[in-house]
UniProtKB/Swiss-Prot annotation:
Entry's localization field: Cell inner membrane
Main location: membrane
Similarity section: Belongs to the inorganic carbon transporter (TC 9.A.2) DabA family.
Top-rank lineage group of the source organism: Bacteria
Name the record gives this protein: Probable inorganic carbon transporter subunit DabA
Disulphides: none
Pfam families per record: DabA (PF10070)
Molecular function as annotated in GO: zinc ion binding
Length: 1012
């Protein structure tokens, strides 16, 4: 940032706004939700450094609590060997060097990790001594007597000196790690951010609105600053009327937000070098609103045309900060006091500052805390004599010094217990020995300890997975002459669907790939008002594919469109009338109460039946229209994302079909049927619906992509072009398309009426097999859902899933990508017949014939960021759901059709809701590639995006040799490390034999059924 200080102020501000994209959430409006790395702005750093930087900047937790990891250790999800190996992997030096007698550093650190470093504060420790048997613990008693604790900092100093030093340190944080709001909250207990948010949120929601706001600011077209300032003159119930002269001051501000910002910033931060840091901290106080405003600023074409500039937002935030802190200072001091005078004010009143600071010391005795709180409350109501502040400060100072006790006796007693030391053993140790023991145990920071636990956690799962792959290597599990080949999305949820299908129909072969199936496109369905991108979010499609009425269906389309438009229009009128009309609203509400109650009872008591009935009635009213694809363009045109080409030329279709089939290794041995199986999710009352859809389709449904690919692959012109390129699809093969609803496990089939008669029997058989597989998959999903039936039959499980999908009160219609942990890139035979618990992304790739790695390079570049984005968003939303996630769905309200808030007054919540991650196990994605280490090394060496992900350890990569099956794990510091472990796995006949009755994560197992 230093170079930016040499630029003119406008360029500096533009540079600062650009830099904010690296620290603020980058979540698109919620209807376009796409998984991404929550810490995308730190991805250029190694994983450990990035987490440390993010925690320092935001205060968020970046690892699971140690207590959760210790629960895993107790339950066997982490073994002692895993923890010991993690110390080696982390790079702790001299692990086998003795520290005290025969105790090595490894022994001491392992004991410290097992016990933990969290000690109760002095107040809690005193209670334990009085109320429990802690005082009788011989180890604790020994250390209370014998351990020489370093005196608490400042214990012998004059309390005025302590107070002044603490006050200077706090003031020094302003502009660096704190805003004035944070300092004043520390002093007063009053948070001006609560008022700021209340003032801002309705204006922000209206300005960013995407179609729901009933009120529009007349000045909205002039930008956010102008619109907000205009409200000071127009709003009869303005939020800031309690502030003296605020309305007049705001109305007389300069018209330019830049001029206002340059006028206000020096009042908050006189040092220009701290301006960016202050703006950054100010933005991070409301990261959701700040991030959405910035996203709309950076993506101007994704709204309704309302001008949105981050400069406007920052100007309003800075102005509010100054106005509200001035008001709080006036009330705090009892008279006008500027921010510039605040340091001197409390430097002259150290006794008052010390009493206020005492309220932030939870270890103080309750009586002293009560007296401090009472005196601060009296100060709010009137004047408090300085003598009272001084008397209480003198009593608080020694207690505050004692509260800083680091709990060494507690920690040393617990550590000794883990090491198996008795008081007799300790008597034989010198003071230097005890100091060395304590120093060694405390040598790891909390972040380092968290990462070591994460390494152990990941290793345990990795060992299970490598054992499974090794045990499965000799099994040739691919059918030689498949009756059908089913191409599904790489999505981890489809791992279960594929496994059950192969158990039911062992002669079916399955493949996995990114769910846009190599066809990046805009799609416009028959009833869609506009086009939608169906491809990875980093891809800009330039082709538009449309769903059109089939020949002879033009009349049906006209009637369908008219009835649908009428239904939607009356729905909208009823909705708006009940919201806005003073008379019609209550009348309509009263008239609709009885049918609304009946509907509510039905959707609550029998949601599945009600949902299916409503869908049938809607279809009967609107009428069904047979459709076809507007697929082929006669000539290529110069296309852009803004002006896309309608359809694809023959050459473009040939190119896309060939590239995709070669990528997944399907170039010969075609079955009679090839099913392209996209996916999406459907549920009710679910603002985060896009988060359950296909990530490779920008959080939309992948069915249209499957349909387009199948239609292209069936065209004679395309097949002729493919044959000329050496890829022959025989006339005995037909492509069909369908979409899997991952929520209710239903299937929507496309264009079956165009299937030639000779394939009809095979299609009917495949329809039955797919339906049976989805029912079996629903039964497996039930085991992780607390409200699902226990060990249900497949039919009952499917009915339960239909009910969940239609239940408006269901916060967990499905679990999404929860528990995702790994990705396999290789032939299906490496994983077919393995129970992987729906935790693995399965991506098809045939290493035979790809000696230079060009094909797998493309797969890694496309699938790597997608899988990493999903895994990392789940990771961070799990470890700190309050900061990186969006809390509970139960309290969410949709705001402006672009996000969710908690209740009616909160920050905009980004990330994943708790119900999506509550069973997730946070770990980095393990990517196993069926290729040699040499080829993968060359690929990473020439691809900076992969270097960032792999060398910075955001994902973990392993190579499985295509011939020998040997597995090597990649470590950026040490290169490729050969794996050698046990390859013994339990074996069962069917998946249900392994998961029935189980509700917790399951280790891999070999499934004997379904493999020929």
């Amino acid at each position: 940032m230093s170079a930016a200080h040499e630029l003119p102020i406008r360029e500096r501000l533009a540079h600062w706004v650009e830099h904010l994209t690296h620290v603020l959430p980058a979540q698109a409006p919620i209807r376009d939700f796409v998984h991404h790395n929550t810490l995308h702005g730190f991805q250029h750093l190694p994983f450990t450094e990035a987490l440390a930087s993010a925690q320092a900047l935001t205060g968020a937790t970046t690892y699971w609590p140690e207590s959760r990891f210790r629960e895993c250790l107790a339950s066997g999800r982490i073994s002692p060997d895993d923890l010991s190996a993690a110390l080696d992997d982390f790079g702790v030096g001299d692990l086998d060097q003795p520290v005290v007698r025969n105790l090595t550093r490894r022994d001491i650190l392992l004991a410290s990790l097992r016990f933990g470093c969290e000690a109760p504060n002095a107040c809690r420790q005193a209670w334990l001594l009085d109320e429990t048997s802690l005082a009788d613990d011989p180890l604790f008693a020994y250390f209370c007597r014998s351990v020489e604790l370093a005196p608490s900092k400042g214990a012998s100093e004059n309390w005025q000196v302590q107070a002044l030093a603490r006050w200077d340190a706090l003031c020094g944080r302003v502009g660096r790690t704190w805003t004035w709001r944070a300092l004043l909250e520390y002093l007063s207990g009053e948070d001006v951010l609560e008022w700021t948010r209340s003032i801002l949120q309705r204006h922000l929601a209206a300005h960013l609105d995407l179609g729901v706001a009933a009120w529009r600011n007349p000045a909205q077209g002039q930008g956010f600053f102008a619109a907000w300032r205009a409200s000071a003159g127009l709003d009869m119930a303005w939020e800031m009327d309690e502030l003296p002269n605020a309305r007049d001051e705001i109305l007389h501000l300069p018209d330019s937000p830049l001029d206002v910002l340059l006028e206000e910033l020096p009042r908050l931060v006189p040092d220009h070098s701290q301006w960016y840091g202050y703006l950054e901290r100010l933005s991070l106080e409301l990261p959701g609103w700040s991030g959405m405003f910035l996203w709309r600023d950076r993506n101007p074409g994704r709204g309704d045309g309302t001008p949105i500039a981050m400069l406007d937002y920052l100007t309003v935030r800075v102005l509010l900060e100054r106005l509200l802190t001035d008001d709080l200072l006036r009330r705090l001091a009892g008279s006008p006091l500027s921010l510039a005078e605040l340091h001197a004010y409390y430097a002259a009143r150290p006794e008052e500052f010390l009493v206020r600071a005492a309220l932030h010391e939870p270890g103080l005795p309750e009586d002293l805390l009560g007296r401090a709180a009472h005196l601060v409350q009296l100060a709010r109501e009137g004047h408090v004599d300085v003598a009272e502040w001084r008397r209480l400060a003198a009593a608080l100072a020694p207690a505050m010094a004692a509260a800083q006790d680091d709990g060494a006796a507690w920690q040393m007693a617990g550590l000794s217990r883990q090491l198996g030391l008795t008081p007799a053993d300790l008597e034989m140790l010198s003071g230097d020995d005890l100091t060395a023991l304590q120093t060694c145990a405390a040598s790891l920071s909390s972040l380092q300890r968290g990462h070591i636990w994460l390494l152990a956690y990941e290793r345990h799962y990795r060992e299970q997975l490598f054992s499974a792959l090794t045990a499965n290597h000799p099994r040739q599990a691919t059918p030689a002459a498949p009756s059908a080949q089913v191409v599904m999305c790489m999505d981890d949820r489809e791992e279960g669907t594929r496994r059950h299908l192969e158990e039911i129909a062992p002669d079916v072969a399955t493949y996995g790939a990114a769910g846009f199936f190599g066809v990046p496109m805009f799609w416009q369905g028959l009833d869609d008002a506009g086009k939608t991108a169906l491809c990875p979010v980093v891809v800009q499609p330039t082709h538009l594919l449309r769903e059109l009425p089939a020949a002879g269906e033009e009349g049906s389309l006209a009637g369908h469109a008219a009835r649908r438009e009428k239904r939607l229009r009356w729905n909208e009128r009823l909705y708006q009338a009940t919201r806005r009309r003073a008379v019609a609203g209550p009348v309509l509400t009263a008239l609709g109460a009885v049918p609304a109650l009946a509907s509510l009872l039905a959707v609550t008591l029998v949601p599945g039946w009600f949902g299916e009935t409503a869908r049938r009635w809607r279809e009967q009213y609107e009428g069904r229209v047979s459709t076809r694809l507007g697929l082929t363009a006669e000539q290529p045109v110069a296309a852009t994302p803004e002006q896309p080409q309608l359809g694809l030329t023959d050459a473009e279709q040939i190119e896309r079909v060939e590239a995709f089939l070669r990528m997944i290794g399907l170039t010969a041995g075609f079955a009679p049927l090839v099913l392209m199986f996209g996916h999406g999710s459907g549920s009710q009352n679910n603002p985060h619906l896009s988060a359950y859809d296909c990530g490779a389709c920008s959080g939309k449904h992948g069915g249209p992509n499957a349909r387009v690919f199948a239609a292209m692959a069936n065209r004679p012109a395309v097949r002729a072009g493919l044959a000329a390129r050496g890829l022959s699809i025989p006339d005995s093969t037909w492509f069909v398309a369908a979409e899997h609803n991952t929520c209710d496990d239903g299937i929507e089939w496309y264009d079956l009426d165009s299937t030639p008669e000779r394939f009809q029997a095979a299609v009917d058989r495949l329809l039955g097999q797919m339906a049976e597989a989805c029912r079996a998959h629903a039964a497996e999903r039930c085991r992780r859902l607390a409200s699902a039936p226990f060990k249900p039959s497949p039919w009952k499980a499917r009915q339960h899933m239909i009910g969940r999908a239609n239940d408006i009160s269901q916060a967990r219609p499905e679990l999404g990508h929860a528990t995702n942990a790994a990705a396999f890139i290789g032939r299906r035979q490496m994983s077919r017949g393995l129970f992987l618990d729906r935790r693995v992304f399965l991506i098809s790739y045939d290493p035979v014939g790809d000696d230079d790695g060009c094909i797998v390079e493309g797969i890694l570049l496309a699938a790597g960021p997608v899988g990493a984005g999903i895994a990392l968003e789940y990771y961070f939303s799990t470890v700190d759901n309050e900061r990186f996630g969006c809390g509970s769905k139960i309290t969410h309200n949709i705001t402006g059709l672009f996000g969710v808030m908690e209740g009616a007054d909160s920050d905009l919540r980004t990330g994943l809701p708790w119900q999506m991650v509550e069973i997730h196990e946070p770990m980095r994605l393990l990517v196993v590639v069926e290729q040699t280490p040499e080829v993968l090394t060359a690929i990473v060496g020439r691809q900076p995006p992969l270097q960032e992900l792999i060398n910075n350890e955001w994902i973990i990569v392993a190579a499985k040799h295509p011939i020998t099956g040997a597995i090597d794990l990649y470590c950026p510091r040490r290169g490729w490390l050969p794996w050698s472990g046990q390859a013994v796995l339990p074996q069962v006949a069917r998946s249900v034999d392994w998961f029935a009755g189980e509700s917790q994560p399951l280790a891999p197992a070999i499934i004997l059924g379904g493999v020929r």
